[in-house]
């Protein structure tokens, strides 16, 4: 068993706290940008537009992630404490909400620049596992999105939460949604799937949703929501919708 007693604050600059969660976003975005610019983008026009697109992506991701968490997972709390919606540094981001925000931002940017939005969404899909990996590691450090009770040798006790031994579900997600997904999509990139805009995006939705759905069986449901239809979590139900969306999109791109 591992004892998790990490401090969510990485360090301080004067009186300003720099949290691991913030660093995860910064590192994930920076490495994703570098990966796209150095390895993925072959078209000169897209290369020139990509830096401006990143601004749209960041805004869409943060707004979508926060509003998604507010609406999907904790609406009553934030209606009672609306000012806390702005306190992103305290955690509380929905991946599915962030994804919706990124899709909207990509569509708006592409319309403005007269390009195919799937070109940018495919690049996001290929680089997103990098950010997901660091984000889940930050979740682990923050003792959030923790797993269900277990007696397995690699169980973790999140002492900031309780004294129960739990699955390190954040690390499961970092491995499958981060590392494995990165190499799976990289394989399809080498097969020239970028040639058909939207194919990589569809595959991302399919594989991410599969990984997320099954890992949710090891992750504790949000206490304010619990289990829903067929004893599934909200994350699983949303993953089913995203999987179906990805499968439908892939069928259109064949």
Where are these regions (language model features)?
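A feature for loop-to-transmembrane-helix boundaries and adjacent hydrophobic helices
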Residues: 1-254
